[in-house]
A protein has these predicted regions:
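Beta-strand-enriched cores of mature, soluble protein domains
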Residues: 24-158
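Positively charged n-region of N-terminal signal peptides that target proteins for export
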Residues: 1-9
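Short, low-complexity disordered leader/linker segments with a strong preference
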Residues: 6, 22-25
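Bacterial N-terminal signal peptides
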Residues: 9-19
Length: 158
């Protein structure tokens, strides 16, 4: 009888230990697409130096989302037709969970309005707390209206 109680106690301790071990983040495929409007920011000389963004779309792990952001356009020292967007964008899922991102390796062709780069996921709220990963982004910008479309493909860890 005493041996049976000891075995039950060991099983209980083992089960409790398993329950407190943190679950590691899982890498998952991520894809989204959407559209938005850029409200361009100009310097005193009238040059576009940045933009305030509003956006919406649909993405894996986000569902329908909205978002806002602010970017700066950094000129390329070697090519006046190229700009390097830098900044932050926060995606907000329909349930309110927030997924902040930072632009990395941004490159925009000012002749075509096509931009590429990476969105690096930052720790957010809700299910995106402690998130990591990144997704390649392609943006097609209309410089006259400020409208743009975008597509992201990559991996997210949470």
């Amino acid at each position: 009888m005493k041996r049976f109680v000891t075995i039950k106690s060991l099983i209980l301790v083992f089960a409790l230990l398993l329950a407190i071990i943190p679950v590691s983040a899982t890498e998952r495929p991520f894809a989204s697409n959407g559209n938005g409007v850029a409200a361009f920011i100009r310097d005193d000389a009238g040059n576009v130096v940045g933009a305030n963004l509003t956006l919406s779309g649909h993405g894996t792990h986000l569902g329908l989302f909205s978002g806002t952001g602010k970017i700066q356009f950094l000129p390329d020292a070697n090519d006046p037709n190229i700009s390097h967007p830098a900044g932050e964008i926060t995606y907000v899922a329909a349930n309110g969970d927030r997924l902040p991102t930072v632009i990395e390796d941004g490159r925009m062709d000012l002749g075509t309005g096509i931009a590429t780069g990476y969105m690096v996921f930052q720790s957010g709220t809700g299910r995106f707390e402690g998130v990591s990963g990144r997704a390649a982004i392609v943006v097609e910008q209309n410089f006259i209206t400020g409208a743009y479309t975008f597509t992201l493909v990559g991996n997210i860890n949470y």
